[in-house]
Regions:
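Exposed, low-structure sequence patches enriched in small/polar residues
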Residues: 1-178
Length: 178
């Protein structure tokens, strides 16, 4: 069950599709997941609550800024795929949805606070240099932060080996700085 409240967005809809126009301003969202054992062949009893806020600001010729904050809490003992798994990006290409230079599926947590800051200059800096302007490169400044923890009961469910072969596993965020 989830909600999304964006008071400044507006929609255009016809018979076949609905298009959302995102304006500068706040967007509030949330999600609640509940696991009930023996319903749809489920084995786990848990509840997960996620609340977030996204703020967009347009700065005219200077660019646009997006700030996002999110709080996540999981109650119950579940295996790592049902916990919050953070997506890493090992390439040098920027991905707004992933944590860059972090390995794919490296960290999990059951309680976390995360934040993202992104500013897109929209050519404000690089369009002043003639040769770089032809490449149509854009400059972006950003930062991403996660603080989280993993309950010891959930940590024990992370497998360390498979058929006698040691495998690389998920790590908890509370093992020190990355």
């Amino acid at each position: 069950l989830g909600f999304n409240y964006a008071p400044r967005n507006y929609y255009i809809q016809n018979e076949n599709r609905r298009v959302t126009f995102v304006n500068a301003g706040p967007e509030y969202y949330g999600n609640i997941q509940i696991g009930i054992p023996n319903v749809f062949q489920s084995y786990f009893e848990y509840s997960q609550v996620k609340l977030g806020l996204t703020v967009r600001k347009l700065w005219g010729a200077i660019g646009r800024t997006r700030i996002n904050g999110e709080v996540n809490a999981l109650f119950g003992v579940v295996p790592s795929p049902l916990q919050t798994v953070y997506v890493g990006n090992q390439s040098f290409i920027y991905n707004t949805q992933a944590y860059n230079q972090m390995r794919i599926f490296e960290f999990v947590s059951d309680r976390s606070i995360s934040g993202t800051f992104e500013h897109h200059f929209n050519g404000f800096l690089l369009n002043r240099v003639p040769l770089i302007k032809k490449l149509k490169w854009r400059s972006i400044v950003g930062a991403k932060v996660i603080f989280g923890s993993l309950d010891s009961a959930n940590y024990k469910l992370i497998p360390k080996e498979y058929n006698g072969v040691q495998i690389s596993t998920f790590k908890a965020l509370d093992n020190g700085p990355y």
